A protein has these predicted regions:
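Single-stranded nucleic-acid nicking/binding segments centered on His-rich, glycine/basic loops
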Residues: 40-44
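C-terminal amphipathic alpha-helical interaction region
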Residues: 46-241
Length: 241
């Protein structure tokens, strides 16, 4: 939800305005505009490093942010410890946004939701591959094998080059799928032993998501070779077009 980043941004803006208000509170009215401009220049000079006018969606900004010493927290497990940092807790409490207990509870809830969501996705992926996709894969392999055998029976010197080529690729994909399924299942079982919420979320990010990508690759490769009639669910092209 955009509500969460907006809470953080609005709290940060409130703190900045509060600091500005404190600095200008005792300034004489006739000098207010001049002092305000001086303060703006000072703040701009101090915080210019966060201003970037290039393309923020490319690696250009990533490299520039690193050069400027700015955070680049790419995942929730990397980012969540920041919410518990002392200065951030004090900021939320100062503006009556969250109490320390509320911050700690949100920390645990966000991490738990993150881990549970990835677990559900991983289990769903395993079910789709094991119960549905592999059936279609093996059925098509069987059909190709039967076709090659029948051609050989009719034409003894038939090379069956196409069937052999596809079968070779499907066999390699099938082997990779089997190994990837085993690894994902094994690593999912290992996550059940982790009790710390941050360590668990980190394991789901670093290991389970990587396992899912590793499983998807051979499935996608095989899917490109399998006719739609053998697939138990619509392909991307069918869903999109």
């Amino acid at each position: 939800s955009v509500a969460d980043p907006n809470v953080v941004l609005n709290t940060a803006v409130a703190e900045a305005l509060d600091q500005i208000c404190e600095k200008l509170a005792d300034v004489d009215k006739k000098d207010l505009e001049e002092e305000a401009m001086k303060l703006v220049k000072k703040l701009l000079k101090k915080h210019r490093r966060i201003i970037f006018n290039g393309n923020g969606y490319t690696d250009e900004w990533v490299a520039e942010a690193e050069k400027r010493g700015l955070y680049n927290l790419k995942s929730l497990p990397e980012a969540m410890p920041q919410i518990k940092a002392k200065k951030n807790k004090e900021l939320f409490e100062k503006h009556h946004v969250f109490t320390e207990i509320e911050i700690d509870s949100r920390y645990e809830i966000y991490l738990e939701n993150y881990s549970k969501t990835i677990r559900i996705e991983a289990l769903t992926m395993l079910e789709m591959v094991k119960k549905d996709f592999t059936d279609g894969l093996m059925a098509y392999e069987t059909a190709l094998t039967d076709t090659a055998i029948q051609k050989k029976q009719v034409l003894a010197d038939a090379k069956c080059t196409l069937e052999t080529s596809i079968l070779t690729k499907l066999d390699a994909a099938s082997e990779a799928i089997g190994l990837a399924v085993e690894k994902l299942e094994k690593d999912l079982a290992e996550t059940q032993k982790i009790t710390d919420s941050l360590a668990l979320a980190t394991a789901y990010h670093d290991t389970i998501l990587a396992d899912m990508d590793a499983l998807r690759a051979p499935v996608d490769a095989a899917e490109e070779m399998i006719p739609e009639t053998y697939l138990p669910y619509p392909t991307y092209s069918k869903l999109l077009f």
